[in-house]
């Protein structure tokens, strides 16, 4: 053990001391200088919303107290340039190494790659670690060496691999590096500006409902595993009450490691399998599948880093989204005239939270009923959700809009009234968030437009006055969606585009990453994060697997397996990026974040298309 090394630990979305690879490695080698750097300018269009910033502030305060108890202070820095702040820390502390844990979103990938390059150029050792995932995105490929584009195939491959089972305990003591705070422009947590005075009254409601911080995450996980997990599958069909794990914001900010969550649930699954407890097994499997969806969201963002801007399926660039600001405003404000949708959007605005099922329903309504651009909805979720997570948001909205190979069928249009009867049969959720409908009989509460005038009058409901009329009726919405799909197909035919092609990233103008020989990259290790390469695949249009050919034959005979398969298919012929396994400065880069506790986000089954 080298006890003379001075290391800067750069905290980001890994605000914990347990099972934190970067912190553990630095503490093992010598003295540490923990730092959190807040650079609003670098967040760009993905500057966190009010609720997310509130959580970050509370979590940082919790982490700061924990580090102080171990003997080291957390230095907070607000800056206009991250690399400049890190270089200032190096200059003042005399540190010779910088460590941090990986992120996987496009914004972070670019930033972290730049940071590593600049530090390596100055002779500073840089090491990054996997502190967020079970498997790194560059570890999971199909037998052809290409990224999976279907969740089922991806997750099956993951479950066939081993998982690191050793949990890293928190350091028992940290050796601090003393540095003059004023020399590096350190600030207080209030001076970070994560919360302004106008936001504090609204945030007070969050304080009563949530307890951010890594130690609180541990308590919540233990309670969920021991008391609620067994009923997780049964409760997933309810939108009222405490039917989810509520772990999503803790996972987003890295207050608990996904490895710890996975292992706890997996242990219960093994016990229930031994005891032949089928209900428990089903619940554990559903919860673990949610963890897999969170993993998959990072995987997609890493291997297809354009997905926050473009649909993964190339033909959907022709889809005629309706950029109607008035409809978007009505959707945001919960004034669509569809009670379940409106209740969900009002809950989101009031609390920064929605049940995963409600997230699916309101997002589906936005893109299928109103034909609003899915990127608008994704950005609004990012701005308002307490557990806003860009990678999960991207996966969720692309899935719902039919923009990924195993997403919802493009022509799928779910009736909110029927979904309300299924997931809120007594209307409890509606009455909680739409008090103007509280007196309406349960028979009509999910479709008040069908209620007799006498019933509406007796319930104090006047459609168009104190509650909105439907913004669009179902038949009209179905007709408009069909026309949009028809226009999309016509545009495809005009340019000869295949309906199953994966979008090629628009990086033609960029040169390929510089590849160095291993001997020329002394600061790079096998643990370091890699970045997508500009090297492209070659190939021809995908040959359909046998079962897909059979499916197509059945469709031609009038047999539609729409419930089992997506109408979209992936294409291995497309130009996509892969991760270079060679040692390079580029391989030292870092990562990029809403359906949030993916274990609590998209619960629908994904299809079987994609790289096998």
Swiss-Prot record:
Q: Please give the residue positions where the record annotates the modification Phosphoserine.
A: 587, 598-599, 605
UniProt biased composition (Basic and acidic residues): 551-564
- Compositionally biased tracts (Polar residues): 596-612
Cite the position(s) of the site with description Involved in electron transfer from the protein surface to the FAD cofactor. 321, 374, 397
Instruction: Cite the source lineage.
Output: Eukaryota, Viridiplantae, Streptophyta, Embryophyta, Tracheophyta
The primary location reported for this protein is nucleus
Q: What is this protein called?
A: Cryptochrome-2
State how changing residue 605 to D affects the protein, per the record. Answer: Reduced blue light-mediated phosphorylation and impaired blue light-dependent proteolysis and hypocotyl inhibition response
Q: Where does Mg(2+) bind?
A: 235, 243, 355
Q: Which domain of life is it from?
A: Eukaryota
GO MF annotations, alphabetized: ATP binding; blue light photoreceptor activity; FAD binding; identical protein binding; metal ion binding; protein homodimerization activity
Residues forming the Photolyase/cryptochrome alpha/beta domain are: 5-134
Q: How is the cofactor bound?
A: Binds 1 FAD per subunit. The flavin in the dark is in the oxidized (bright yellow) redox state, whereas it becomes reduced subsequent to light activation and formation of the neutral radical (pale yellow). Binds 1 5,10-methenyltetrahydrofolate (MTHF) per subunit.
Q: Which cofactor does it need?
A: FAD; (6R)-5,10-methylene-5,6,7,8-tetrahydrofolate
Q: Where is this region: CNT2, binds chromophores to sense blue light and mediate CRY dimerization?
A: 1-485
User: What is the gene name?
Assistant: CRY2
Q: Region CCT2/CCE2, mediates blue light signaling: which residues? A: 486-612
Q: Which NCBIfam families match?
A: crypt_chrom_pln
**Effect of altering residue 476 to I?**
In strain: cv. Cvi-0
The organism encoding this protein is Arabidopsis thaliana (Mouse-ear cress)
